[in-house]
Design a protein with these regions (language model features):
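Extracellular/periplasmic bilobal clamshell ligand-binding domains
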Residues: 302-342
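Early extracytoplasmic/lumenal segment of secretory-pathway proteins
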Residues: 26-94
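A ligand-binding cleft/hinge motif common to bilobed small-molecule-binding domains
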Residues: 93-95, 217, 222-240
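Extracytoplasmic ligand-binding site segments that recognize negatively charged/polar headgroups
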Residues: 37-44, 82-220
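Periplasmic-binding protein-like
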Residues: 133, 196-200, 237-263
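N-terminal secretory signal peptides and thylakoid transit peptides that target proteins
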Residues: 1-16
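Mature extracytoplasmic/periplasmic domains
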Residues: 260-318
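Short amphipathic alpha-helical coupling segments at ligand-binding clamshell hinges
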Residues: 43, 47, 150, 191-198, ...
Length: 342
């Protein structure tokens, strides 16, 4: 049976209203929480475009930090979260996980999980670390005669007295400083009485919530816990600084991925998570931020040996912490920090 002209035009119009598979994919949007500043720009320039090529989906960035993302999730509730995936420090992830926001990872949808180091999987199957920013000891080479070799030197080298910088307790690094001191001078990381006493024994310190670089550059401090990548950047700017990888192990900022149990784009979230764990994305992150990749297939090349000292077999030097313990005692520990450390 032949179509008349009106029927043919009607059929064409109806077909035009039906989205193609490619168009449908383009209509899907994944909201990705990310840090601001250089992280946001890197995500816009590198990560988001690469994921769009892979998935055909759009990416909308929601800029903030772990505290902001947690507040947004709690305001919406576990049943209607604004995100499908969250990447943040485990200290924030642990509390949200306990409140029922995240699901146990479906590893069938996350094949690159099997290529990660064991140190990246310490969340009981609920999350996975994409990368670490290891923290050792940074110092001024022109103001220190005896460079540190280990964390204990912060207490034992008289040159450092009243010239030490610390992150404050609001920062996850401040919490790690307490647990580290507890481990160094007490029975274990839970021996916070010993930890607080040790921190008090440091004497007067300069504390910051985020940036120790300004104080180090100005000579207000001569030594502090420092992200290796930050020391590498300061050194390239001509500042007389260096770092050491402490003998007792390193602290580290983690970027832990979590899938929302009731997220609006959960399948897309798994694609995105698997992409971030891929060798290609891990290479981008390592070269962009000097982070330690968690995919075992990606190791720091010789030209990045200084910028990324913790890689390959050295990933085992990253110290692990009980964030459930920290979160359970958050208020008490914060008050003790304020009265003991300042």
């Amino acid at each position: 049976m032949e179509l008349n002209r009106r029927q043919a035009l009607g059929a064409l119009a109806a077909a035009a209203l039906l989205p193609t598979r490619a168009a449908f994919a383009q209509q899907r949007t994944l909201i990705v929480p990310t840090l601001g500043g250089v992280w946001e720009q890197f995500w816009r320039d590198k990560i988001a475009p690469e994921f769009t090529k892979l998935s055909g989906a759009n990416v909308t960035l929601d800029v903030g930090n772990g505290r902001v993302f947690g507040a947004n999730l709690r305001a919406a509730g576990p049943q209607k979260p604004p995100y499908s995936i969250v990447m943040t420090n485990e200290v924030f992830s642990e509390g949200l996980r306990k409140e029922g926001f995240f699901e146990q990872l479906d590893l069938a949808k996350l094949p690159n999980y099997n290529s990660t180091y064991q140190v990246a999987r310490n969340t009981g199957g609920y999350g996975v670390v994409v990368c670490y920013s290891p923290v050792g000891i940074g110092y001024r080479t022109d103001m220190v005669q005896t460079p540190p070799k280990r964390w204990h030197d912060l207490w034992e080298n008289p040159e450092f007295r009243n010239r030490i910088g610390l992150y404050n307790f609001a920062n996850s690094a401040g919490k790690m400083e307490l647990l580290l001191a507890s481990r160094l001078f007490g029975k274990d990381q839970y021996d916070v009485d010993a930890g607080f006493k040790a921190l008090a024994d440091l004497g007067q310190v300069i504390q910051v919530d985020f940036n120790l670089s300004t104080a180090l550059a100005a000579g207000e401090i001569v030594v502090a816990p420092f992200d290796f990548a930050e020391i590498a950047r300061l050194k390239k700017q001509g500042l007389p600084v260096d770092y050491v990888v402490p003998e007792e192990g390193v602290m580290a900022f983690d970027q832990t991925l979590n899938i929302l149990a009731n997220g609006p784009e959960k399948e897309l979230a798994y694609q995105y998570a698997n992409f971030l764990l891929s060798p290609e994305a891990q290479e981008l992150l390592m070269r962009g931020f000097y982070v330690s990749p968690t995919n075992t297939a990606v190791k720091a090349p010789e030209e990045l040996a200084y910028e990324v000292p913790i890689s390959g077999d050295r990933m085992s030097e990253i110290l692990q912490w009980d964030w459930a313990f920290v979160n359970e005692h958050q208020n008490e520990l914060s008050e003790r920090w304020a009265s003991t450390v300042g």
